[in-house]
Amino acid sequence: MPVLLTPICMRIWENGMLQETHGEYRDAMQALAQRMEVPLIDAYRDSFRIVAAAGEEGSKAFFMHLAPGEDARYPEGLRDNAHTRRAGAARFAESIARGLIQAGLVPAP
């Protein structure tokens, strides 16, 4: 059985507020899941809550915010609000796994 998954949110803050992203894409995924009558895991909603709760500074730990010299692949540093670091990937994957369990698609551990 197919399962659809919305994208995680991006870390875009303006005036201290986390901004909505992926609106039309998320809506299209929800409509497709309804039309196909398949489960949808709303990773966007859950990741938005996680990032918002971490705050503007704290949420940097989830995304590719690297200081110069922190990672040899990015000697000058990096500021990427779309792609996750290991901590973010693990936290968002945990949330997705919880969604799969709540939807009855996989058994609880």
Features from the language model and the residues they span:
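Conserved, well-ordered alpha-helix/loop/beta-strand core segments that scaffold catalytic motifs
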Residues: 2-5
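Catalytic His-Asp segment of secreted/periplasmic serine-dependent ester chemistry enzymes
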Residues: 7-109
